[in-house]
Amino acid sequence: MIVKFSNKLFEYYFQELAKKIDWFPSIYSIGIINLFEQRAIDNNKVFENCSFIFLHDEKPIACFIGVKVGQKGKMNIRAYELPSIILIDEMNFSKNQSKLFILEIEKYINDIAGIFYYRDTMLDGSLSILSKHLLSKGATAIPKFSIFIDLLESEKKLKSNIRKSYKSLINWGEKELKPSIYDASNITWELINDFRLLHIKESGTETMSELSWKKRLDTVKRGEAFLIVGH
């Protein structure tokens, strides 16, 4: 069974699948995807969300996050501003199910005249089933390296990994600024809106719509992000 992004149950199954993944890229959370969607609307982009979740025995075992986006006549597939991604519960994913999963993704790839952008995290050094399939069809791979900071580490360990040129800035900030941390428990629209108005005043222009700012607020309320303000 396939559950598409437009289905009200998509978010529930998505969260259930994310719990099973050893490392879930938070940049692909529902709140962030909703924010990127709003930015696409603000920029008058043409798009169609193709994301879906693959179920087996009413349980989510795989997910594709991808969106047809671009201009009429030439649509690419990506996750709005990010490459597309797949999430798989490897423990419960059979070879036959993987074939059906790839076939479903291929339907969307074959329906566009543009490029299919896809990101494989390769956490264990292995390519995903989709990467192997795409490479066998002549896809081009471009390796990129990312560094992720584990904020659950102690403050001492986090500071030990900071380059010297940044340490002086942090030391200055600790002396001169009074940081306030906002999360789902204390964030408000009034705070975000004050920051939005300050941003407009200082930049001299409105770079994001009010709805985009509200989507940012939603990511904090969902527990997917937090805000640090220094004054």
Question: Where are each of the predicted segments found?
Answer:
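A conserved beta-strand-loop-helix scaffold within acyl/acetyltransferase catalytic domains
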Residues: I2-D57, I61-G73, T121-H231
